[in-house]
């Protein structure tokens, strides 16, 4: 998460400066053949437009003499060359060889909005080692869902670096066909940003002059990139064909009558994914026998506050393309469409037969259509999972200004003797002085429910957001969710309520470390949620959290907070087999503090602790996440999340643990892997996963994956639990043909 925040903040904040420069810069086509070797002082780079940089942190607006970037193109590729001088080259942070890894290395990030949509961008980052990291930005950086900043989005592109006695340099080569350029007035227009960091100095620089210090937090995104024109560039249609072959050997246990029976499952499968640019503005994706065997397993979570649902991020590649287009904010951390409802049923994977997705623009409207069919699964004595069709339709149209839109979404989940349909309207309205109004309304219909009632089957969300990070800023929201509202393809944090939310904050930046201890401080005076029943007869939940956070000039940050909370339980909440909060009214309070180290350190030890009353007793919550970097080839990431709950009236207490250790290794830029071990004390299971990837080049991979879960206490039930529930070893080969 830290890597996403750092790269996003760097790209986003700098883009305000681009907005101040309205002149379109002409990028000329190269007449030279650029050899991708990481050197930018070669003859082939002469004559290209050179962008200069200005410092963003810690000293605002100072000119930077250490960094330059050049951009050009030929018939097939966009090229970027960056010269990043370093007076102390031995201090370059260079410890990442993993694709999409992040360990606090120095980086160069190139963001491009291919058609000056002023909403969407692709970000290509490279580290001194040559390791690469890419992501997509949607909705102009306005967080409408989990896909606004999407680090799981992978592109086919190349990058090379060189480290010298003067610093380091990088060259990019990005296929034109992957960028979906569209000619307007016989020109190709785009927006760009470039960021360079020197993390040992906690320093970052950007192209072009910088904004005033009082800037919005995340609004200055693609809408304020530097406008450029690619003179003489001709768009190329996108065509990618990715067949795969897969073999797996596995076994699982299922309960049959009076015992657990083992079932072996050995498979050989094949499938194909196709991406085709129907027009310059419309892209069609087709997937047959869709597979996600190489996707890393989810982190284990214990839901102590199990009055809310747990949101897990989408990691599967098929759902990453234009994922932000399908974001529909249905309220606090809630979505009308949640892609993890497809192919995952009650935590169990169900095969996807295939599907299609169409995304792009029709006239000035963003359009998206998605439809997938899952296979039915026979579970023996546990019943079966029916084959289902999942479909989504999405429209969005710009109104008022570049940062505002109105939209429509419809979802439909269909299986034998059942359907669930949802429709909704949403919008984002950018108002003066960094103020945003974000409304949505949606309604659902499903078979075998009570008669449709507009209020009971609907949900309304209204959000007013002052999007700043210094000075005074605030958020205010209202949300209503009817008793029968149930989006079969969505995610709801909470259901059946009225909710009122408000926050009031004050932030302050300091540029001179000789005059202040903290580079940034923030006071949150109020951060409060109030939940009522749908008829306003009872308060369900109320809380207010006030906190202070400060970030030092070296990147270390500290937070302290206090919280009051009220809960009305109409039915007991069970945390473990021995811990249960009974029906009743509860008021509790707790305090906490946390420390997060600067990401430049080889050894990092973030820690968070809180303690206070908790229903009928107390809870001590502790979280530590140590990371140790052993150079470029090996690192260890660990986490320990613990809750010590004591209920004096029941004379019970228990420690609840979730422990995870992840070993990441990389022999070079092509061969890498990881080993993960996780323990969950509530389920009393230990989960293991090992993953090896040989990346010949982007789109050409071999994966070896092993997953298994172990039952630690097999005597929890009668008959005894099996040693494990599922075990599988998979080898997968895929190759992408593209032009």
Question: Over which residues does each language-model region extend?
Answer:
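Bacterial Sec-dependent N-terminal signal peptides
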Residues: 1-23
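Structural preference for beta-rich elements and adjacent junctions enriched in aromatics
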Residues: 20-396
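Short glycine/serine/proline-enriched coil/turn segments at secondary-structure junctions
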Residues: 61, 164, 182, 415-418, ...
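Membrane-spanning beta-strand positions in outer-membrane beta-barrel proteins
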Residues: 79, 169, 181, 240, ...
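Short, glycine-/Ser/Thr-/acidic-enriched flexible segments
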Residues: 85-86, 115, 197-199, 246-250, ...
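Catalytic-domain carbohydrate-binding cleft regions of carbohydrate-active enzymes
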Residues: 172, 189-191, 262-264, 269, ...
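Outer-membrane beta-barrel transmembrane domain signature of Gram-negative proteins
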Residues: 212-235, 375-430, 466, 557-610, ...
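Exposed, low-structure sequence patches enriched in small/polar residues
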Residues: 351-353, 359, 428-432, 438-739
């Amino acid at each position: 998460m830290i890597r996403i925040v750092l790269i996003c903040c760097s790209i986003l904040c700098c883009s305000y400066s681009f907005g101040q420069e309205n002149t379109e810069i002409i990028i000329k086509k190269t007449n030279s053949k650029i050899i991708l070797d990481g050197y930018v002082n070669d003859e082939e780079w002469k004559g290209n437009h050179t962008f200069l940089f200005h410092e963003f942190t810690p000293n605002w607006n100072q000119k930077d003499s250490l960094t330059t970037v050049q951009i050009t193109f030929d018939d097939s590729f966009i090229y970027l060359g960056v010269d990043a001088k370093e007076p102390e080259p031995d201090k370059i942070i260079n410890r990442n060889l993993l694709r999409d890894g992040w360990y606090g290395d120095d980086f160069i990030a190139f963001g491009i909005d291919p058609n000056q949509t002023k909403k969407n961008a692709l970000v290509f980052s490279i580290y001194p080692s040559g390791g690469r990291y890419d992501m997509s930005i949607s909705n102009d950086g306005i967080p409408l869902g989990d896909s606004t900043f999407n680090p799981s989005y992978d592109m086919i592109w190349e990058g090379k670096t060189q480290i010298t006695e003067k610093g380091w340099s990088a060259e990019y080569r990005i296929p034109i066909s992957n960028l979906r350029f569209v000619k307007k007035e016989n020109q190709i227009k785009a927006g760009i940003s470039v960021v360079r960091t020197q993390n040992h100095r906690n320093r970052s620089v950007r192209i072009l002059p910088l904004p005033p210090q009082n800037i919005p937090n995340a609004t200055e995104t693609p809408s304020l990139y530097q406008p450029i024109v690619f003179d003489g560039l001709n768009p190329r249609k996108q065509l990618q064909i990715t067949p795969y072959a897969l073999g797996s050997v596995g076994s699982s246990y299922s309960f049959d009558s009076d015992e657990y029976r083992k079932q072996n499952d050995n498979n050989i499968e094949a499938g194909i994914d196709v991406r085709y640019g129907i027009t310059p503005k419309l892209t069609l994706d087709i997937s047959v026998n869709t597979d996600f065997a190489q996707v890393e397993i989810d982190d284990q979570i214990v839901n102590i506050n199990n009055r809310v649902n747990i949101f897990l991020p989408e990691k599967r590649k098929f759902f990453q393309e234009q994922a932000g287009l399908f974001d529909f904010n249905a309220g606090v951390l809630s979505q009308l469409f949640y892609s993890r409802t497809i192919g995952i049923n009650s935590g169990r994977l169900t095969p996807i037969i295939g599907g299609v997705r169409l995304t792009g623009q029709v006239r000035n409207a963003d359009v998206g259509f998605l439809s997938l069919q899952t296979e039915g699964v026979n579970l023996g004595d546990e019943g079966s999972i029916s084959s289902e069709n999942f479909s989504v339709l999405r429209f969005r149209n710009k109104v008022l200004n570049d940062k505002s839109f109105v939209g429509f979404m419809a979802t439909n989940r269909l299986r034998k003797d059942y359907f669930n349909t949802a429709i909704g309207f949403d919008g984002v309205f950018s108002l003066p002085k960094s103020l945003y109004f974000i409304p949505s309304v949606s309604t659902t219909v499903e078979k075998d429910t009570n008669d449709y009632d507009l209020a009971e089957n609907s949900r309304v969300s209204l959000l007013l957001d002052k999007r700043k990070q210094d000075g005074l800023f605030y958020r205010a929201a209202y949300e209503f969710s009817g008793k029968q509202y149930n989006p079969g393809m969505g995610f709801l944090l909470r259901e059946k309520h009225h909710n009122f939310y408000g926050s009031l904050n004050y932030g302050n930046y300091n540029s001179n470390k000789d005059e202040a201890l903290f580079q940034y401080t923030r006071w949150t005076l109020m951060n409060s949620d109030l939940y009522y029943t749908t008829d306003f007869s009872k308060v369900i939940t109320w809380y207010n959290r006030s906190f202070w956070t400060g970030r030092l000039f070296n990147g270390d940050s500290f937070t302290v907070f206090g919280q009051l909370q009220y809960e009305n339980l109409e039915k007991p909440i069970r945390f473990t087999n021995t811990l249960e909060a009974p029906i009743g009214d509860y008021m509790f309070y707790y305090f906490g503090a946390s420390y997060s180290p600067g990401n430049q350190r080889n050894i990092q030890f973030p820690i968070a602790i809180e303690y206070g009353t908790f229903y009928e007793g107390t809870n001590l919550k502790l979280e530590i996440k140590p990371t140790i970097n052993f150079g470029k080839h090996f690192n260890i990431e660990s986490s320990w999340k613990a809750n010590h709950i004591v209920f004096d009236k029941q004379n019970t207490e228990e420690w609840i643990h979730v422990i995870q250790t992840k070993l990441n290794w990389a022999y070079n830029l092509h061969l890498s892997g990881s080993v993960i071990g996780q323990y969950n004390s509530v389920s009393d299971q230990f989960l293991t996963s090992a993953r090896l990837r040989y990346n010949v080049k982007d789109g050409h991979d071999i994966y070896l994956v092993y997953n298994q879960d172990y039952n630690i206490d097999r005597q929890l039930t009668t008959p005894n639990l099996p040693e494990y529930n599922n075990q599988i070893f998979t080898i997968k080969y895929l190759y992408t043909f593209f032009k």
